[in-house]
C-alpha cells in the first residue's frame, strides 16, 4: 500500500508539473481594459461619451522618453534587464513578511503589477502571490518588454476617474502627453504609488514632495543629471 501511495504521489506531482509547464506556453488573453465610447453626429461632432473606466489607450511611441524613464525610475529601473521577477526584491519582501508575520511587502516589478492588476486581484495571500508569479512568467514569455510596458501604462489608475496616461494628462493638466513639462511628467509617474494620497487636488504638498522624489530617483538611476 505504501508503494502504491508513493506511485500515486509521484504521478500526481508529474501531472501537475507537466500541466503547469504546458500552461506556460499558452499565451494569456489580452487584458480587459474598458475604453471610452464616443458618439458623433452626422457632421462628425462629438455628442457624448460613455465609459465604465475613463481610458483612451495609447501606443508606447506616443509616450515621451522622459515620462517613460520617470516610471522606470520609481517602479522598476531594471525592467529591461530582468525577466519579470527581481530575486533581490523577493528576498527583501519575504524577510519583511516573515518579521511582520503577515504579507505587507509588494516587491512587484512592472510585469508583476500588470499580471496582478489585469488578471488577478489585490488580495495579499500566498496563493495569489504564486498565481502572480505564474502570470508574470507567461507575460514575459509571450510579450515583448515594450508591449508589457505599454499595457502597464494604459492600465494604471491615476485617481479622479482617470485610467491610463492619456486621460491622466488631460485630467490633471488639460494637456496632451507631448505638451507636458518634466515636472508634470514626474508628478504623473509619482501618482502610481498612491493616487488618492499624492493627488495635487487633494494633497498638493504631498504631490510636490512625491514629484521631487521621482526626479531624485531619476538622477540616482542616471536618467537625468
Feature map (PLM): residue ranges:
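Juxtamembrane regions of bacterial inner-membrane/periplasmic proteins
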Residues: 1-225
Amino acid at each position: 500500500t505504501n508503494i502504491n501511495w508513493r506511485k500515486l504521489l509521484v504521478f500526481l506531482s508529474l501531472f501537475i508539473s507537466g500541466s503547469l509547464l504546458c500552461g506556460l506556453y499558452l499565451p494569456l488573453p489580452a487584458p480587459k481594459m474598458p475604453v471610452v465610447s464616443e458618439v458623433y453626429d452626422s457632421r462628425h461632432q462629438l455628442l457624448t461619451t460613455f465609459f465604465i473606466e475613463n481610458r483612451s489607450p495609447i501606443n508606447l511611441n506616443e509616450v515621451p522618453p522622459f515620462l517613460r524613464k520617470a516610471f522606470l525610475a520609481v517602479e522598476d529601473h531594471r525592467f529591461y534587464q530582468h525577466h519579470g521577477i527581481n530575486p533581490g526584491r523577493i528576498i527583501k519582501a519575504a524577510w519583511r513578511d516573515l518579521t511582520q508575520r503577515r504579507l505587507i511587502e509588494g516587491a512587484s516589478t512592472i510585469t508583476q503589477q500588470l499580471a496582478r492588476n489585469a488578471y488577478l486581484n489585490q488580495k495579499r495571500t500566498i496563493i495569489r502571490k504564486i498565481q502572480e508569479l505564474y502570470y508574470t512568467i507567461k507575460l514575459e514569455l509571450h510579450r515583448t518588454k515594450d508591449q508589457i510596458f505599454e499595457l502597464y501604462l494604459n492600465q494604471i489608475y491615476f485617481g479622479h476617474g482617470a485610467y491610463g496616461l492619456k486621460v491622466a494628462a488631460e485630467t490633471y493638466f488639460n494637456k496632451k502627453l507631448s505638451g507636458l513639462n518634466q515636472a508634470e511628467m514626474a508628478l504623473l509617474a509619482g501618482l502610481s504609488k498612491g493616487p488618492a494620497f499624492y493627488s495635487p487636488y487633494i494633497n498638493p504638498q504631498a504631490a510636490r514632495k512625491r514629484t521631487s522624489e521621482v526626479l531624485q530617483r531619476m538622477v540616482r538611476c542616471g536618467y537625468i543629471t
